[in-house]
Amino acid sequence: METQGASLSLGRWSLWLLLLGLVVPLASAQALSYREAVLRAVGQLNERSSEANLYRLLELDPAPNDEVDPGTRKPVSFTVKETVCPRTTQQPPEECDFKENGLVKQCVGTVTLDPSNDQFDINCNELQSVRFRPPIRRPPIRPPFNPPFRPPVRPPFRPPFRPPFRPPIGPFPGRR
């Protein structure tokens, strides 16, 4: 009887631990990831925009390292680029291709990771039109060719040519 009561008690504890294990992930899964919060902010920017096409996340700066409450505002910095999808479409921006030579905007501000709180404060400024073309390959710049200095090669020194000395034959004037 005692073992039967112990096994019932153990079964109840197992059931409680199982239920607790199911509830805790649900509570922690409610917080958005940094990227998800930024994607929601981009969606809100697209809804509030008066421009013809949707914008899509191009680059996201790394998340701050501090672990804080999901309800607090986190600083964000990211870039968006114009897509080919019109703003009136129901298609998500992530499924749209980037527009060739589309506008690129740098955005900074704050977002919250709490999914029930869609508050964000984002300001975007146009950077430039980005053209995706391969870089021009140019040959490397080389300095002009200057060979090492070498003095001119001269023939070995030879004295001027003089015929060999031949004593004169005959009487010499001034000698006796």
From Swiss-Prot:
Residue ranges of the propeptide: 30-130, 174-176
Residue numbers carrying Pyrrolidone carboxylic acid: 30
Broad class of where this protein is predominantly found: secreted
Modified residues annotated as Proline amide in this record: 173
Localization of this protein: Secreted
Domain free text: BAC5 sequence consists almost exclusively of X-P-P-Y repeats.
PANTHER family noted in UniProt: CATHELICIDIN, CATHELICIDIN ANTIMICROBIAL PEPTIDE
Family under the similarity heading: Belongs to the cathelicidin family.
Protein name: Cathelicidin-2
